[in-house]
Amino acid sequence: MLTSGNILLAGSLLSPEPGLIFWTTITFVLVLIILKKIAWGPIISALEEREKGIQSSIDRAHGAKEESEAILRQNRELLAKADAEADRVIREGREYAEKIRAEITEKAHQESQKMISAAKEEIEQEKRRALAELRNEVADLAVRGAEKIIRGVLDADVQKKVVDSMIQDLSTNRN
């Protein structure tokens, strides 16, 4: 009988009875109304909040991406400017070094020309002084020779002695 009771009970659930359908519908509608009043609002607002939070996160992510791209562009521009500035500084340094080298070379050339000119002038003065001294000595020797000739006899032996004497005088005066 127990078996037949289960079948009977199962049969009553499967067979549509108007009272059961009515009360099931009423219960379903009441549950929907209660859920709409109590749970539907908070669920929808939670979903909307969640959607707003996700949208806000997406917007912030887009903003951060754009900002990072802008910073990256700015960094690249700054790097390019720094490279250009470094190239300019190096170029100016090289130009300045070349200018200084040229100035130093020119100054050294001028100094060497001055030194050469001064040395030539000094050599020329020494040469003139030596020639003047030599002329004076030759004149002195000539005067002494003439004096000796006038005092002595003019034969060949005397002349030879006078010349030898003048040569010796010249040698001793130079030393």
UniProtKB/Swiss-Prot annotation:
Family the UniProt entry places it in: Belongs to the ATPase B chain family.
Disulfide bonds: none
Stated name of the protein: ATP synthase subunit b 2
Protein keywords: ATP synthesis, Cell inner membrane, Cell membrane, CF(0), Hydrogen ion transport, Ion transport, Membrane, Transmembrane, Transmembrane helix, Transport
GO cellular component terms given for this protein: plasma membrane; proton-transporting ATP synthase complex
Principal subcellular localisation of the protein: membrane
Described function: F(1)F(0) ATP synthase produces ATP from ADP in the presence of a proton or sodium gradient. F-type ATPases consist of two structural domains, F(1) containing the extramembraneous catalytic core and F(0) containing the membrane proton channel, linked together by a central stalk and a peripheral stalk. During catalysis, ATP synthesis in the catalytic domain of F(1) is coupled via a rotary mechanism of the central stalk subunits to proton translocation. Component of the F(0) channel, it forms part of the peripheral stalk, linking F(1) to F(0).
Transmembrane segments: 20-40
Superkingdom of origin: Bacteria
